[in-house]
Amino acid sequence: IIPITIAAFAAYAFAFMEFRGKEPLFLLVVASMIIPLQMSLIPLVQLFKSGVEVFGLPIIPALDINGAFVATWFAHSGFGLPLATFLLRDFMMSLPRSVIESAKIDGASNMTTFFKLVLPLSVAGIAAFATFQFLWVYNDFLVANVFLGVYKPENLVVTSHVSQLAVGAYGEAWHLRTSGAIISMIVPLTVFFSLQRFFIRGLIGGAVKG
């Protein structure tokens, strides 16, 4: 929810608004998608623990949120925000500009245009990315394990709990593991099939006729 909300506003700004530094800023967003997730884990752990200081001046205060769920929220939001902005911006660019220009001629503000026109027309693209984001976060092991499992073992992700199910008398209780794995698939399958209609529409890129 967090990256989708922020990215929707950012995508509208990149698609329909003119401001200084627009192109370099968008290139920075695209370039941030190239950074491997693994390279940013240690800096994020340090950031969440000690904050950031420049010449002894605290720029970002020490939050000390490692081991809390809010750390994974920030991490997943930060990793998903560039891709969300990129995809939604391309989707909004495919919308008919005549509709947007007509709204501006009629005196509609950017907020009115966004909420009344662009947002309803972008439901398919938002739902498509929401499906991607949910499946990634639900299946994620590395980020959740780094920010939760290392500090509080009781906060282990579903994958770890499934792998640690009861051990039988003569070895691993594979029947429990397979049952747990199948049960853990119910939630993502439910989300995917409920959003399948929007997911397919979002992938083909918003063919909207004005």
Language-model features, listed with the residues they occupy:
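A structural signal for multi-pass alpha-helical bundles of membrane permease subunits
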Residues: 1-210
